[in-house]
Swiss-Prot record:
Substrates-to-products reaction catalysed: 6-sulfo-beta-D-quinovose = 6-deoxy-6-sulfo-D-fructose
Species of provenance: Alkalicoccus urumqiensis
Entry-linked InterPro entries: Fuc_isomerase_C, Fucose_isomerase_N/cen_sf
Protein's UniProt name: Sulfoquinovose isomerase
The EC number(s) this enzyme carries: 5.3.1.31
Gene label: sqvD
């Protein structure tokens, strides 16, 4: 759970009775959703605030700085001098219009935002009273974002084998990745993983088959590639536990087919279904993109695919991959079906079209200028799979050729992550908190 430091700020020259009522309502709201650190009273001077902060023993993950009345920049400066964590600046409404300005909270929030911007300190802004549904919804959204940021900063991505030759977009500068996101990479030799997988005994790999059988229709447990899938998945679980991994980027071809005699797609699908997001072709930023979508959507399974086809009739883009896709992403009409790799003819892979619904497409991208984020929305259409493997056809509101052209001119990497949820607002906040540009395509 997110640990939040609540700072209710007010000056005694304003209406502190109204301010304190709003403070109490806010505390009740926050206690329902986060682990709260609160002074339980208004902070009306920098000395009060400093004394309280000195007594805070547990490290918070975020600050809710509520400008209950106007207050100068000393208050927030004292907080950011002590903490580098994200801040939610919260201004409340005036209790009534006419006569004396009782709170001047909005100016307080404006002043606070200026101080934070001048300090290059990550923050978001919230306006309204704690009893408003829209405020509660946005606050919950911001907490999801900040919890995701917290998890990204401690993320350890397991990279199992180097990316294929020429797949430059799959790699990363590990130092820059850590400097920007806090995430780190742990490398595992793919052939060591193969050797470990082959030694996994049946009593350890059989439960993986039993789990897959519940979600993959007509899966043949006697197929040798099903056993190979289960053995490699079991080996991955060992590495995940040993190295404390939270995401995977796995080199799949040609090594899996040549050395293991099976496709990697099923392991990627199986683990992603369990929120251990796994990207093929050792795409490190693809794994990071999937991880962020999974956390922002409260654990929904993300997908990673290439943009491969334009369907003008449906004004849609088709995304595809060889055979990876979490089981729960399959259309209800077909369910998740086992198959063989379309090029190598080895199993087992996933064969299905993705289910319908609103989706957010997202990518953590990189250029010579540094990191950037891509986001746009679409509608996954209820259509059969378009090619062997897994596919999703994304209907757009804007002309499909215009969207495709813009994506090409922006030059984003050819792996796009998506999730069945609208998290575009959250992606914008992710960009703000990591101080990254967000390229939002009007699609």
């Amino acid at each position: 759970m997110l640990t939040v430091l609540y700072l209710p700020i007010a000056r005694k020259t304003f209406n502190t009775d109204v301010a304190d009522t709003l403070r109490q309502e806010t505390e009740e709201l926050l206690q329902e959703t986060v682990e709260l650190i609160s002074p339980m009273e208004l902070m009306t001077s920098p000395d009060d605030l400093d004394a309280f902060l000195q007594d805070v023993s547990s490290p918070p993950d975020a600050i809710v700085y509520q400008s209950l009345t106007f207050a100068d920049g000393e208050f927030i400066q004292a907080a950011v001098d002590r903490y580098s964590i994200p801040v939610i600046v919260w201004s409340v409404r005036e209790p009534e219009v006419g006569g004396r300005l009782q709170l001047n909270s909005l100016t307080g929030g404006n002043s606070t935002s200026h101080v934070l911007r001048s300090n290059s300190h990550p923050y978001s802004f919230l306006f309204g009273n704690p009893d408003e549904a829209a405020v509660q919804e946005r606050l919950g959204s911001l907490f999801r974002v900040m919890d995701t940021v917290k998890q990204v900063k401690s993320l350890n991505i397991g990279v199992i084998g180097e990316h294929p030759p020429g797949f430059y977009f799959s790699g990363t500068d590990t130092g820059e990745l850590h400097d920007v996101f806090g995430a780190k990479v742990t490398t595992v030799d793919l052939y060591d993983a193969f050797a470990r997988a082959k030694d996994v005994p049946e009593e350890r790999w059989l439960p993986e088959v039993e789990t897959a059988e519940k979600q993959v229709l007509t899966l043949n447990r006697d197929d040798a590639t099903v056993q190979r899938f289960a053995q490699f998945t079991s080996a991955m679980r060992e590495y995940i536990a040993e190295e404390n991994l939270s995401a995977l980027a796995i080199r799949c071809w040609p090594d899996f087919f040549n050395e293991l005699g099976a496709a990697a797609c099923s392991t990627l699908s199986h683990l992603t279904e369990e929120s251990m997001v796994s990207a093929c072709e050792s795409d490190i930023h693809g794994a990071l993109s999937m991880f962020i979508l999974n956390r922002l959507s409260a654990g929904r399974a993300p997908y990673l695919g290439d943009m491969v086809h334009v369907n003008e009739e449906n004004n849609a883009l088709v995304f595809w991959h060889c055979g990876a896709g979490a089981y729960s992403l399959a259309r209800e009409a077909t369910g998740a079906q086992p198959g063989v790799h379309p090029n190598r003819k080895l199993g087992f892979t996933m064969e299905f079209g993705l289910k319908a619904g609103e989706v957010t497409l997202f990518r953590v991208g990189h250029t010579p200028e540094g990191y950037r984020l891509l986001v746009f929305k679409g509608e996954a259409l209820d259509v059969p799979q378009r090619f062997n493997g897994t596919t999703v056809e994304i209907g757009l509101k804007q002309p499909v050729h215009s969207v495709m052209q813009e994506l090409m001119e922006e030059g984003f990497e050819p792996h796009y992550a998506l999730v069945h949820a609208d998290v575009t607002k959250e992606i914008r906040e992710i960009g703000r908190l990591f101080n990254l540009p967000v390229v939002e395509i009007e699609a």
